[in-house]
């Protein structure tokens, strides 16, 4: 019996190791190209509005894909979907590397990479829930969370070094490493019984069209894109009210505290994602830093600090309550943006400190938004509601990156608004940092107002 237990325990540990590898490279794929955006812009002679689509394209299919894979896991099985995700991710890597001289091929490759990488976060949690014993799941989730945090931390550093000393196109090949997990996962994961069920393909297509055209509007400001987006969403809303198993539960729309929490959380997450995508442009223009310096010196310390803030945030939520932690997180965010807008021209190390507090504030806010939103859901709404929150979180990051890319390309914002004598290179970034601070404060006030008038005690 001890031998059987040891073999089972060994199998669970092996599964966990390969899941950690997939989780690490999923996050790395998202973060690694961020520091290279200015280099890509120079190579293709493109404005930030276009260049930021390198990340937006990935986040778009990544966010939609996480929801799709989660829905399909029971119908098609985890093994099939993981294999499909890995192959698609690697296929996108090859296309991107081979066609990196063509901007349209690069964007297409990032769409494909996102569609493949989405399988990892969506299915890893399902695998842990199904294969890891209940008494070890907490440790498993904690380990995966730490690996994800490490991926977020080292991603900019790795990206900066490779882009500076070799070429940014080689970053596209990094996800190819995930292919080594295939034979092991196929052997370790059991054969699953497929469950028949309905899949709302029409709903996914309508929502995807609406999202894509809205993002195109945020970077080109073409009214025709906005019209197509609005029409797609209207048809989507009408559609999900008719079908029996819709992609998004329309009943959640009646839960006002939940919807406001998701919306305000999405705005905050998107604002921070947009800020992080702006940092490489800002450091290049204002402080003339290299790509390696931006990744290793400026962004790396901030991304690694999230491990500490995550631990502290969890303790504070339990001891002082979610709204207390939300106030701290929003204060970190708004004050950091406001301070940076006035002191942007100081030493580049100052931005490292700002990023530490921005990402720390984001982590506090994420923890609280999840707590508050889940508390506003009835028991039968919990699964669909939290899935929608995760989907919105990923999607808002891609949207934030797209919107900030569009704002960086507007000449009207490149004017001096602050009553200070500063270099002209700081005008655009200082104005956007002021805007970010205002958005954070407004989202915070709306969230507080809604939950203070709700019937639940948070």
UniProtKB/Swiss-Prot annotation:
Annotated GO biological processes are: proton transmembrane transport; response to antibiotic
Give the GO cellular component terms, alphabetically.
plasma membrane
Q: Provide the topology term for how it sits in the membrane.
A: Multi-pass membrane protein
Q: Which Pfam families match?
A: MFS_1
PROSITE patterns, per the entry = MFS
Concerning its family, UniProt says: Belongs to the major facilitator superfamily. TCR/Tet family.
* Protein name per Swiss-Prot or TrEMBL: Tetracycline resistance protein
Can you name the source organism? Answer: Geobacillus stearothermophilus
